[in-house]
Amino acid sequence: MGSTVSVPQTRTMRGDELSADDAWATLRKYGGWQLTRDSLVRFRYGDGMSHSRALAFQVCLAIIPGAIALVGLSSVTHQEELGQVLELTLRRLAPGDGEAVRQALGSGHHVRDALALWLGLATTMVALTTAMAQFERGANRIYGVERDRPFHRKYARAAVLALVAGVIMITGFTVMVGGGAIGEAMTEVFGWGGGTRQAFALVRWPLGFLLALVATVTLFRASPRRRQPGHSWLAFGALVALVLWTLFTLALALYTAHNSTFGATYGPLTAVMALLLWSFLSSIALFLGVAFAAQLEACRAGCVPPAHPDTGPTAEEEREPLVGAVGSAVIAAVRRVVALLGRKRPGRTS
């Protein structure tokens, strides 16, 4: 369990919901630097990194089998063009030569059993549902809520969020990150002209951003076990999450594109490792956005501190006897050396 301070439910303090104007006024009163510092503290003591790792793992379990199942189902349902667009897009997005992606997606073409493919898609939805449940757990800890909803309510809500917010978020992220690859795939499969590609290139950024923003605000509103403020208030934290996600994605893209040792190290697993890193960084961005939204609401309620005071043992109490003795001896030796060097330094004449 985390040690974050519970955020008061400001939605019940007045008759109406908090809006974007309230968020802006609170931010100006609070100060950007203090909000950033306290949000990072709330993220840390809410076990944000641990929940980010768990969420990234669940997202990968949903994306990989889901892509294989969709490519296979496109052949079974005689929608080969859509399957080709998906396959070409993923192969262009994958770093390296994309051989592992080609083989994985090719296995979907060889599977002609519709039942097996539908079961694979169902497995993807189960993994995405558990990812939404994991997001609820992480958001609760960051807000200072120590217990999640009962099992049936938690996973029923997570299933709905997976079908709504999860699918919309993945679509928005894919349109923004892979818009160029999607345009090339659509041109190759459906014969898009230059005008259509240019129009798609102009529309994909605002469209993808809007889809990702709507999905993120929906997650921030529906996931925590508390009465959340209005959507426009939560849009502040969602914007922080999307800005961080964009920066993380660009940094990862530059790293994989200009680091030749990355592909040489992982070989055919390069695409999988890139997906793991991207999922982890995306999860960090989401939970940091939750932390910013939570701390801003805490300030609205009276500048509640982000974490409880440390009641653990002091440094002297937790230090092992041998380690403490060795450390004290090293510190004493360093101090003697510094003092000796100070005495040997020639004095300056005025």
Please tell me what each predicted stretch does.
Residues 2-350:
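Membrane-embedded alpha-helices and immediately adjacent juxtamembrane helical segments
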